[in-house]
């Protein structure tokens, strides 16, 4: 039942590897240290079944940890063995999966042994405030001499009726920093000794960003 759990990892970048047919495959590298079960939620006490997972355990003296975290979080960490984690994520699972783990249990890439496809969730790269041509792929205005709206969006409303622009239209705004899930990525290799996973293709985020890896739904293997 641990196969229902997700893993918190870190994007390390991209590299190329050769597959068994000799083809060059672009892969994303994800490093996964030990994940800790920080909290268990059941339908009887919380209304749903879930497991809270912690990662990136702080290696520092106790006095330093007390300064970095609030008293509420310190009390929360003591229930799971006293290990303070920088990252906490909650995964909704079945009742059997909750019963298969205990507070303070550690697990890693071994739960994905034999898994061929995974879903990866992360925060996309932030690109700042962008116009409609970059963000939405608008064509823009005429490029001829005398034109004054080369990169404008064009008309987005009418005159006196309704006398306003309807909400939800595509306009210049902040681009990136969105929660993105890339589904059904092929697992190229899982190296338990080096604690890294190679998946085919690109994943959201910058180098060093936190990603959540889970088994793809509806995919055998």
Curated annotation (Swiss-Prot):
GO molecular function per UniProt: rRNA binding; structural constituent of ribosome
Cellular compartments per GO CC: cytosolic large ribosomal subunit
UniProt cross-references to Pfam families, sorted A to Z: Ribosomal_L3
A biological-process GO annotation: translation
Keywords assigned: Ribonucleoprotein, Ribosomal protein, RNA-binding, rRNA-binding
The protein's role, per its UniProt record: One of the primary rRNA binding proteins, it binds directly near the 3'-end of the 23S rRNA, where it nucleates assembly of the 50S subunit.
Subunit architecture: Part of the 50S ribosomal subunit. Forms a cluster with proteins L14 and L19.
Family designation: Belongs to the universal ribosomal protein uL3 family.
Record protein name field: Large ribosomal subunit protein uL3
Organism: Chlamydia trachomatis serovar L2 (strain ATCC VR-902B / DSM 19102 / 434/Bu)
């Amino acid at each position: 039942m641990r196969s229902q759990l997700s893993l918190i990892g870190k994007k390390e970048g991209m590299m190329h590897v050769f597959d068994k047919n000799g083809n060059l495959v672009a892969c994303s590298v994800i490093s996964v240290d030990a994940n800790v079960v920080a909290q268990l939620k059941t339908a009887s006490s919380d209304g749903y079944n879930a497991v809270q997972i912690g990662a990136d355990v702080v290696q520092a003296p106790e006095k330093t940890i007390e300064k970095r975290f609030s008293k509420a979080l310190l009390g929360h960490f003591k229930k799971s063995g006293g290990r303070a984690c920088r990252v906490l994520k909650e995964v909704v699972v079945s009742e059997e999966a909750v019963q298969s783990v205990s507070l303070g249990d550690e697990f890693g890439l071994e739960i994905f042994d034999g898994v061929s496809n995974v879903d990866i969730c992360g925060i996309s790269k932030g690109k700042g405030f962008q116009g409609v041509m970059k963000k939405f792929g608008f064509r823009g205005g005429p490029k001829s001499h005398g034109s004054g709206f080369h990169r404008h969006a064009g008309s987005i409303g009418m005159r006196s009726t309704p006398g306003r622009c309807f909400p939800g239209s595509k306009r210049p705004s902040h681009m990136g920093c969105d929660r993105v899930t890339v589904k059904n990525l092929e697992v190229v290799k899982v190296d338990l000794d080096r604690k890294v996973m190679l998946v085919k293709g690109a994943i959201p985020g910058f180098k060093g960003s936190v990603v959540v890896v889970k088994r793809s739904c509806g995919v055998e293997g």
